[in-house]
């Protein structure tokens, strides 16, 4: 009779030990329900002699961050879904609202024409990408920055004695875009740009 009680007690102990085993779920990141991004800006397509901007901005969903180094990392977590990643740099005479960049207006001296925009905005670069976020993932992204402002140089060479008689040249360029939606590459209405000319005196 005592031997039978001993066997039953051992069986109860084994049952308790087996019921205490728990299976843990393993995750790949510390944020199993969200995704996280890191954005590296690639400025290699900029024009010769143009410096890398000192600061640049990253926007995605309701997140906005500013960066001064090569890669932007943030603790912000994104719920699963589709987002538009927009990257751009602050530039003189250009404002950005969402993904629409607008050049500051200027005054012109030709009546009956379209509006004038500033003729010397800062160097402006942009990048956009559709990003699909899944939970429990990190996303290293590269933004290949596109240069949106270019420099135009025109040289007027008078012939004969015209060079000595010219005191001023007044000109403007038509058809310039005053706004740009850089997510869709859609340009706004045509505007005018005043072209400033400086007299160059060659000394032979």
Regions found by a protein language model. Give the residues of each.
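Bacterial N-terminal signal peptides that target proteins for export
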Residues: 1-10
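C-terminal motif of bacterial Sec signal peptides marking the signal peptidase cleavage site
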Residues: 17-20
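Bacterial signal peptide processing site
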Residues: 22-25
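A short, Gly/Thr-enriched small/hydrophobic beta-strand-prone motif that recurs across taxa
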Residues: 27-46, 144-159
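Hydrophobic beta-strand residues in large extracellular and virion-surface proteins
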Residues: 37-39, 58, 85, 154, ...
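Short, low-hydrophobicity acidic/polar segments
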Residues: 56-150
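Short helix-loop boundary/capping segments
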Residues: 151-204
């Amino acid at each position: 009779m005592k031997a039978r009680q001993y066997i039953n007690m051992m069986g109860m102990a084994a049952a308790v030990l087996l019921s205490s085993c728990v299976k843990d779920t393993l995750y790949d990141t510390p944020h199993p329900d969200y995704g996280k991004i890191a954005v590296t800006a690639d400025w290699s397509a900029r024009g010769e002699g143009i410096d890398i901007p000192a600061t640049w901005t990253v926007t995605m969903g309701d997140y906005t961050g500013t960066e001064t180094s090569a890669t932007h990392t943030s603790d912000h977590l994104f719920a699963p879904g589709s987002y538009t990643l927009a990257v751009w740099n602050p530039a003189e005479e250009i404002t950005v609202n969402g993904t629409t960049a607008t050049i500051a207006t200027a005054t012109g001296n030709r009546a009956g024409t379209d509006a004038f925009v500033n003729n010397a905005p800062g160097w402006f670069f942009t990048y956009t990408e559709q990003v699909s976020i899944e939970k429990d993932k990190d996303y290293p992204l590269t933004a290949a920055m596109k240069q949106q402002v270019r420099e135009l140089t025109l040289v007027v060479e008078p012939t004969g004695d015209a060079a000595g008689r010219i005191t001023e040249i007044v000109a403007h360029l038509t058809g310039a875009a005053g706004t740009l939606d850089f997510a869709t590459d859609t340009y706004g209405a045509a505007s005018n740009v005043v072209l400033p000319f400086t007299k160059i005196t060659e000394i032979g």
